[in-house]
Amino acid sequence: MSRNPGMTDEAIIKMYKSGMSFKEMGPIVGLSDRAIRNVMYKHGISMNREQYSGQPRKHKVNEDYFKVWTHEMAWVLGLFVTDGHVNKQLHSIYFSQKDERILQLIAKYMEADYVLAATGPTKTTPTLIINSKEIKKDLKMLGIISNKSLSVPFPNVPEEYLASFVRGVIDGDGWVQKSGYVMNVTSGSQDIAARLLFVFQSWQLRSEITITVSPAGNYIYRIWVKGKYELPKLAEIIYNNAASDNFILHKRQRMSQRYFI
């Protein structure tokens, strides 16, 4: 096997130290387990048995995090539904977010070690790694499994925490026009789209769905909220129980700006 472009020894070592297993690293790096180990030996990097065997290194995390509903948990779940990934083979989940402050906050809420996957020429978005069999099981109970993007269901969120969950969804896959008149959420899941539309309509917001088809032939759903008065109303609902920092700053600013006009 030959290395993938950009995979220097330093990048491989950083990836290993982030907690990724040899099995996870192989397709990214383009090397076999043995070749990756040789890189570690070459640079005097100590290896534990779990990594040698291909299992992810254990990190600190509150394994009961998704068992108890709170506004913070609902927000994190909304982010995971949109920006998360469940590893099919390993007991690992990943959060990807351009705003690294959000990843730091997720790690804080989940009492998790702040371990990021290595970035490279083809992987530039910061990704938080959490290794936990229990958390993976709890997410499955909520209907969230690997390869979820086209089939993930809208979780059964208690009414009390619904606004916080929707805030997480908007922070993950939402877009807000700079002028503050238009917002949409993009999803490949018909259930997410239909249920989100129902929620917006139940909040008496002017909303609609548009559907397009991707080059791969998959449906892409966009759920819209439009109007000078609609977005401030949405902002009032979803930020009511937010802390001072658990949201994407520019999205809140854009949605809320019409309050002051």
Language-model features: where?
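Internal intein/HINT superfamily modules and their associated LAGLIDADG
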Residues: 1-261
